[in-house]
């Protein structure tokens, strides 16, 4: 199955506090055939969406206006929902618990996003 087939029709949660980046991610996800089902620009909204929305996969900005997103990652992980961290600081900046987890370096390109989301989904499925 190709990367585009894997992503086609998926419901995606975007957690990002910068509105321009949010819009860019939304456009990229639409180009990949995904549907954005939620966009959270702050920690509280991210937690609410992570707990209640039907989500196939998520992209999480690590730093939400000074608040770290890792409790949201815990919620998604507990629900069995794959996700990708987006960080300007690099994967090495992730805490030990999340070292080696799927991440993409900002600024994100559509290819980076597709590869990261595809990897997160494959790892969650164990394939």
Which stretches of residues belong to each language-model region?
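Acidic catalytic/metal-coordinating carboxylates
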Residues: 68-71
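A Lys-centered signature of the CheY-like receiver
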Residues: 106
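Non-catalytic signal-transmission and effector/linker regions of two-component phosphorelay proteins
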Residues: 1-11, 95, 109-127
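Two-component/phosphorelay signaling modules centered on CheY-like receiver
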Residues: 19-38
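Conserved acidic carboxylate
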Residues: 16
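Acidic, metal-coordinating helix/loop segments flanking the phosphotransfer/catalytic sites
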Residues: 39-57
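Hydrophobic/aromatic residues positioned on beta-strands within the core alpha/beta folds
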Residues: 84-86
């Amino acid at each position: 199955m190709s990367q585009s087939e894997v992503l086609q029709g998926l419901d995606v949660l975007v957690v990002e506090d910068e509105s321009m980046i949010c819009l860019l991610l939304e456009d990229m996800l639409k180009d990949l055939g995904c549907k954005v089902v939620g966009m959270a620009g702050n920690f509280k909204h991210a937690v609410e969406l992570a707990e209640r929305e039907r989500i196939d996969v998520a992209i999480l900005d690590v730093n939400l206006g000074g608040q770290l997103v890792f409790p949201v990652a815990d919620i998604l992980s507990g629900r069995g929902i794959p996700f990708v961290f987006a960080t300007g600081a690099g994967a090495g900046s992730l805490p030990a618990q999340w070292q080696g987890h799927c991440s993409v370096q900002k600024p994100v390109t559509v290819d980076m996003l597709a590869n990261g989301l595809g990897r997160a989904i494959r790892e969650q499925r164990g394939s």
